[in-house]
């Protein structure tokens, strides 16, 4: 079922003031470190924002800049995507696993992941995040969902989905780099739930989110875990994320 956009928290065009922080090595004083914009905080327990480290902010600075060429945009986006996948894997359940090392038969008490995972990309921008998932999880299954806005109703419409047959038995990493109003992502969640995937087994990964989109998601699906690199100031009158980075799909695939 398509989400009723009239029930979503709508943008007002009034942006939150972006917070700032001093970034640099911990051994330096704040007056020796530059001040930079960091993520807006949100009060939703199911939203995880990556630590606002100098590395992450430097990577985000590169992909936000309008002068960054396509090759660099792809390279730095992939680095952030890798950080997102690594963080998402931290939210999966594990089981105890004791192994024997090659050193004199010594044992090591460790853990192993519980259950199977798969990725699902919201086409086409979400496909840009698949490489990072494959680099972290060998032979991972990846499904696809195509959702586009209906020109007559202005509501998201499902055009296509191809998902693993046993997806209901897997943990799902849903991939889409930008979370604006959340309309398309909410429909994607509906598709997954319709296939029998439990809500608490879905993790939604994105590079940049708006406070409005994060709130819509958290309120409608409080058991879905959102993992994002940055929550921006908000949405403008055209529902563009501000300050944003432009059209991710265009910059990754064509520009």
Task: Give the ranges of each region predicted by the language model.
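PRPP-associated nucleotide enzymes
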Residues: 2-255
